[in-house]
UniProtKB/Swiss-Prot annotation:
The gene is TPM2. Residues 32-43 have a biased composition (Basic and acidic residues). Residues 32-97 are annotated as: Disordered. The keyword Repressor does not apply. The lineage of its organism: Eukaryota, Fungi, Dikarya, Ascomycota, Saccharomycotina. This is Tropomyosin-2. It comes from Saccharomyces cerevisiae (strain ATCC 204508 / S288c) (Baker's yeast). Involved in cell morphogenesis. Binds to F-actin and stabilizes the actin filaments. Present with 11100 molecules/cell in log phase SD medium. Residues 1-161 form a coiled coil. PANTHER family: TROPOMYOSIN.
Amino acid sequence: MEKIKEKLNSLKLESESWQEKYEELREQLKELEQSNTEKENEIKSLSAKNEQLDSEVEKLESQLSDTKQLAEDSNNLRSNNENYTKKNQDLEQQLEDSEAKLKEAMDKLKEADLNSEQMGRRIVALEEERDEWEKKCEEFQSKYEEAQKELDEIANSLENL
């Protein structure tokens, strides 16, 4: 009788332990899903920035084209040569700066894509692990109920004696 009580207590403790693990895994899943959502939002933000930078690059390329035309005209007008050359240099620097910003944004976007993929794989793995734990928890619950039923039968048979 004492062993059965100990076994019951052991099963209860084990069941509680599994329930705690299940709750921990459920919380981790929520955190990962939230992190994934944040990463997706960051990707959207970076995509918008990327589009904005693309627009700026096109604008700057257009400005650069205009500047080059002015530079050709400035060869005919020596007095304006210094002004056009300086403007051309400034626009080229802006273009380089924009290209650097675009490259940085693209790198961040690639990194965010990788992080998003990694988080997705991690979520899938955690969901599979959660499913395994839920299955084990159900098995332990079933075993607990069987043990409880056996204990009740033993108690009834002892009372009948």
